[in-house]
Amino acid sequence: MTDITGRVALITGAARGQGRSHALTLAAAGADIVATDISKPITTVPYELATPDDLAGTVAEVEKLGRSVIGLECDVRDGAALDGAVEAAISHFGKIDILVANAGIWALGPLWELTDDQWQDMIDVNLTGVWRSIKAVVPAMIANRGGSIVLTSSVNGFEAGAGFGHYVAAKHGVLGLMRNAALELGRYNIRCNAVCPGFVDTKMNDWQGAYDMMAGGPGGTREDRQSGAHNWSVLAGRGALSPATISKAVLWLASDDAADVTGVALPVDGGHLILPGINADPVHDL
């Protein structure tokens, strides 16, 4: 089993979903955890975001694993708040070895109908928030003579997605940011990679808009979501992926097992990106 005993990991978006899974997986492998999350609504996000109780739940689950943990309410759109989280981590643990920049949102809307706020919130959280997270931790990692940064992109960092172009733009940007961070930080023994999940079973895609997308129109159900998830994978029996599957990749990238791996975008998608491309909704006549 991969061992990261003695490491300190700061994880954004850690209150639930993939972020909580990452926190528990890294803690089970020996890391102490700094768990952060916004824990309040964003008006342009159409589903309920994590709550302070969710964040407290992550903290409690990490403690059950016998690891030290602090939970901090922190909005990745706020650079000062991220700096404060890093300061709290250094004060409590003395260092930060690992950053998992996981915080993210998803929403739907044709590109030409998005409001300025919808566009800006998506970019501010999913791209600028990742940059702010890197910016906040790098000085501490340089002082510590190394570190590992794992960013959450998506299969939509490689491909387009009809109806959520602002998300696609942000996730493409994360991969460019990752590569440049790897290039600039290598001289300080800091690695930077990205994990690119496929369709993962979390609250982010468990709402009516996601059901309708999977059903191909209004009136979709959760069953349509579950059934449609099978279309995202080439592997037998795979529907929506478990967050734990993504966490295993995050742990590997964060660990010394990947000591010579940097600048890599790692899909964890059940083979989604090798699926033959088709037009699922062709227009036959003008």
Give the predicted meaning of each segment.
Residues V62, P110-L111, Q118-I123:
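Substrate-binding pocket helix/loop in short-chain dehydrogenase/reductase
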Residues E159, V250-L251, T262-L286:
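Short C-terminal tail/terminal secondary-structure segment
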Residues D3-K40:
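Canonical Rossmann dinucleotide-binding motif of NAD(H)/NADP(H)-dependent dehydrogenases/reductases
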Residues P139, L183-E184, A259:
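Alpha-helical segment proximal to the catalytic Tyr-Lys
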Residues A194, G216-V261, L266-G270:
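C-terminal helical subdomain
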Residues S154:
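Residue(s) in the substrate-gating loop at a strand-loop-helix junction
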Residues I134, A170, M178:
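Active-site helix of classical SDR
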